[in-house]
Curated annotation (Swiss-Prot):
Residues 326-335 are cytoplasmic. It is a single-pass type I membrane protein. This is Antigen-presenting glycoprotein CD1d. The keyword Translocase does not apply. GO terms for cellular component: basolateral plasma membrane; endoplasmic reticulum membrane; endosome membrane; external side of plasma membrane; extracellular space; lysosomal membrane; lysosome. It comes from Ovis aries (Sheep). Expressed on cortical thymocytes, on certain T-cell leukemias, and in various other tissues. Heterodimer with B2M (beta-2-microglobulin). Interacts with MHC II and CD74. The gene is CD1D.
Length: 335
């Protein structure tokens, strides 16, 4: 594996240049999951993100990385992408073969799963930070630091053997270093140019309050709903004046169908202590104009509001039909 990857590296470096980091950065992350059921069956899938967006995927059934965005090629040429695809094809076949060889050398047996995570982030002054870690059954085993493989602090003793074998392969180490510290930052720089409009998209949230099912006698469950915001990072808190309420419970940030996000934050309080509470929302799309909603004790849920509005329309419609019917019948009586 090392010799072949090293030769590929020497050929590739002839056409790849240096990069300059842009002012705004988005972390690039990839995750590889490889499942080994036995000595002959294995599956490897890969996912890649730039910030919150997923520009690539690599399914086990495919020999190439698939573009998920129209701007996924970045500023790389077709030739550069073709060579990268070849590098990863060599890597995947070599990885599977090498893992099977390690299984013969080390304690343990099939089935097992390996997770490999890595990525890079561009920082000011043309600096980048990169990382690469490997885990077995979700427990860290080793990482790539500088130009060497290093065993994780709580890794089993056999991880030292794996690191020793990997560190003897100078060609592969140089290829990994090149991919992490040269190619990854250059790829991210290009993606931030071609995907600029989508990466920097800002959508303002809307927020509303509700009261949930009573958690007990003389107790209230207050809900603060925030929806339709993008990007994902958001800060929502129940407040009393300028003080944060320590009992605030935040749910998971959930995706909407339009690629924006939704969050519900709750607070359980005594009925007599609800007055004076407010929900505060901070988001990048709002600038310094935070959303502040005050609890007045008369809030009803948005669902109930919708039901009431529908009821009003139904009553108006029925009333209109009755009025029309009576008027029409009166005209018939006159004629």
């Amino acid at each position: 594996m090392g010799c072949l990857l090293f030769l590929v590296l020497l050929e590739f470096q002839k056409i790849w240049g240096s990069f300059e980091a842009p002012q705004t950065s988005f972390p690039f992350r990839f995750l590889q999951i490889s499942s080994f059921a036995n000595h002959s069956w294995t599956r490897t899938d890969g996912l890649m993100w730039l910030g919150e967006l997923q520009p690539y995927t690599w399914r086990n059934e495919s020999s190439t990385i698939r573009f998920l965005k129209h701007w996924s090629q970045g500023t790389f040429s077709d030739q550069q992408w073709e060579q990268l695809q070849h590098t990863f094809q060599v890597y995947r076949s070599s990885f599977t073969r090498d893992i099977r060889e390690f299984v013969k050398m080390l304690p343990g047996d099939y089935p097992f799963e390996i997770q490999i995570s890595g990525g890079c982030e561009l920082l000011p002054r043309n600096i980048s930070e990169s990382f690469l870690r490997a885990a077995l059954q979700e427990k860290d085993v080793l990482s790539f630091q500088g130009m060497s493989w290093v065993s994780a602090p709580d890794a089993p003793p056999w991880s030292q053997v794996v690191c020793k074998v990997l560190n003897e392969d100078q060609g592969t180490k140089e290829t990994v270093h090149w991919l992490l510290h040269d190619i990854c930052p250059e790829l991210v720089k290009g993606l931030m140019q071609t995907g600029k409009s989508e990466l920097e998209k800002q959508v303002k949230p809307e927020a509303w309050l509700s009261s949930g099912p009573s958690p007990g006698p003389d107790r209230l469950l207050l809900g603060c709903h925030v929806s339709g915001f993008y990007p994902k990072p958001v800060w929502v808190m129940w407040m009393r004046g300028e003080q944060e309420e320590p009992g605030t419970q935040q749910g998971d940030v959930m995706p909407n169908a339009d690629s924006t996000w939704y969050l519900r934050v709750t607070l359980e309080v005594a009925a007599g202590e609800a007055a004076g509470l407010s929900c505060r929302v901070k988001h990048s799309s709002l600038g310094d104009q935070d959303i502040i909603l005050y609890w007045d004790g008369k809030r009803v849920s948005r669902g109930l509001i919708v039901v009431l509005v529908i009821l009003v329309f139904v009553l108006l419609f029925v009333g209109g039909l009755v009025f029309w019917f009576r008027k029409h019948r009166r005209y018939q009586d006159i004629s």
